[in-house]
Amino acid sequence: MAQIFHHSTNLISRLSIYGGVFILGLLGAALYGIELSPWYTEQNVARQQPVPFSHKHHAGELGLDCRYCHTSVEKSSFAGLPPTQTCMTCHSRIWTNASMLEPVRASYRDDKSLSWTRVNALPDFVYFDHSIHVSKGVGCTTCHGPIAEIPLTWRAGTLYMEWCLNCHRQPEKFVRPKSEVFNPYYTPPKNQLELGRKLVKEYKIQSLQNCSVCHR
């Protein structure tokens, strides 16, 4: 039987198949890279706020305790945002004419809350409780990064499920003494795993990975 196609057709077919697979793989890698990029996750990207609040100045240089502003972090699922009255505790006496603080003064005069932009906004289908985490020895910087060194607040983690599960699967790598939970300069010791295992047992920490724990 006469050959219909030229021998070169075999080469073209192979190149087409391999090329298609390569392009699909390249496209998948590109999409994966985009999904992990700050452009998509907003990780390490400072959010625009009504007032350029600096954690570096307040928590770092002045040494304000996290709980001074985030008053409900130990007893509620939400850490809480400070009312304008908290800001005015200091700023009714210092930096009283600073133009960048005019929104704070206007908020106080008009008795109208500032509209802060959430930096770590979880989807509605995710349940998270701040109080249980801090009560089990999870420090602020574990999730929020070196907050006392950040001028304008940004998201330190991706907030992806994998990011949360890294800690839930091996809490001994991240847990710290309760006395150090609000210490923004805490550094894990060299024997972190040994200390972590001890604290996991002492604090009765469970490695919770069931879907219903966070997706209720």
Which sequence ranges carry the predicted segments?
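N-terminal export/targeting leaders of redox proteins
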Residues: 1-52, 56-60, 64, 68, ...
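A short, flexible N-terminal coil/short beta segment enriched in small residues
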Residues: 18-22, 90-95
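Nucleotide phosphate-binding site architecture
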Residues: 59, 88, 134
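The canonical Cys-X-X-Cys-His
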Residues: 63-72, 84-93, 140-146, 163-170, ...
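Beta-hairpin (beta-strand-turn-beta-strand) motif
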Residues: 58, 92-93, 131
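Primarily the internal scaffold of c-type cytochrome electron-transfer domains
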Residues: 4-6, 94-126, 171-216
